[in-house]
Structures are given as structure tokens and as C-alpha cells.
């Protein structure tokens, strides 16, 4: 009979315990189990915005347009995240802790994978304050944080539950910039915590890029769980090698932009509108190759274009002479780039 030192039940329970503990500590996203009860491997997320047509009107004069609801839709596909580790019977006998260490590493790598995906989604935030992470001007970074919080407050006045996520390089800059303004609050102590600014706990993560940092509430990012943590074992009886696979099936998505603000560097490439002719039904232009969307505004209406290799085009209501066209390009992890207004 083979010498199996850890049963499947014990290994499965160890992995779940390690992973669930770490995920429950996440300040940056929350879980949703709705996919577990549904068939299919894709989900469409719609983000709605209503335009503002509230205006002062003179006697006998009314509004020229209506308040309309626009939305953007993004499709996400469920993915399987898998890790694999192995050990020999002899290794486990020499030092039993090696198994726990390997399993702990798998759980940590799983969490790190989800964290990287969450940060990639954070980079799509549209409430952005431009920040160079280099200025030595007094109160520069503190003022940027306050401006970012103001963007959140405009739609969500409650600042509780927010955390600022920064990179290691930003940590050095922030400590120099803020000095004593970086308050250390005992109640906020956790892994990566370096202090609080403007009442917001600051946490460092190696997964965060140097070009942006994020002020985020868990409501902004959702982990859609398709299947919980599962483990599978294999064993080479001849070499006495034990192999364990760990899997989690789901997807990470930015689901509520009202709960996140980003401080980010400027894009290096301009957004440009190609002037359309009178009667045109499309508006086109160029932007940075890494842009994921361009929002075009004509009067009170907005349209969203999805760029390809730095070029974009979107169908619009027929444009007329005198129409003013604006466009803003969004790149993951960078401040939006506004195009020069074009008049038809």
C-alpha cells in the first residue's frame, strides 16, 4: 500500500482555509456567487450613466433636449486559475513542514493572481486625477488625494471602507512628500499598511503599477465565482512523488466606477478628432495604442468607441454644421487624454 502522508480531505481543507482567510482580508474587491448557479462561461456587465439636461429657463422657454440614459457594455469570460506543486515522501519525512509551506505558497500565488487581475480592472477607473509621482511642491500629493476623494464624494458621500493601493516606488515618494502628514493609525494595521492620508489607509502592493495608485472600496471590484476552490491529487508510486493541483474558476471585473478613484500619470499620446463633414453619421480619430475606449460627446449626447491599434470610430446621430465635438481617450492606468474640441 502506498505511503500517502496527507489525505485528500486534509489537503483540500488546508488549501481552502489558507485561501479563504486571505481573500476575506481583501480590501479591494468583493465576491459574487451568481455565476455558480448559472450555465455559461461569459457575463456581460453594463455600466449606466444619465446625462444632465437641468438648465435655468426663461419665461415661455423650455428645455431643448431630454435627459437620456447611456450605457457601455463589456463582456467578460470565466477563466480557470490553476496551480501545481509536488513533493516526495522522503522530503515530507525529513521535514513535515515542507508540505504546509508548499500549500501555503500555492494559496498565496492564487491570491496574488486575483490581486493582479483586480488591479488591472482598477486601471479602467474613469474618476481620475493626474499625478506625476515626482513633484516636490509642498502638499502636492496630499492635495491630489483630496481632489480624488472629491470625485468620489460627488456620487458617494461616505468615505468609509476606502483604501489607497500604491506601489513600492510610490511608497518611497509618498513618505518623502507627506512626512508627518502620513498618519499611522493602529486600528488600520494590516499587511502592507504604511499609514493613512486624509483619513484613508494606505497599503503597498508589488502588484500595483508605478504609473497609478487607487483609492478603492470593495464595492468597485467584483470577483464572480463560478466554482469554488478545488484540489486534485496525483501520485507517482514508483518515485513516491505526490502532486497537488489547486483550481479556482471565475472572473474579476470593475462593476461600479462610483466606488473608485485613480491618481495617474498622463498619457504620452494625444487624442485627436478627425473633423467630420456636415451630415456625417460617424466620428473618427486617433489615440494612444493602449487606449481601451474613447468617449465622444456631441451636445448632450455621448458615444463610446473601442479603439483598435490607436484608431477609433463610432456611429453617431447625424452631425450638423455648428456641432461641437469633444472626445476623451482612456488608457488603463493613465489619466484620460482630452482631445481639442472640433466644430463641424
Language-model regions: role of each:
Residues 1-73, 221-222, 226-227:
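N-terminal "assembly arms/tails" that initiate or stabilize quaternary assembly
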Residues 191-234:
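Glycine/small-residue-rich hydrophobic helix-like segments
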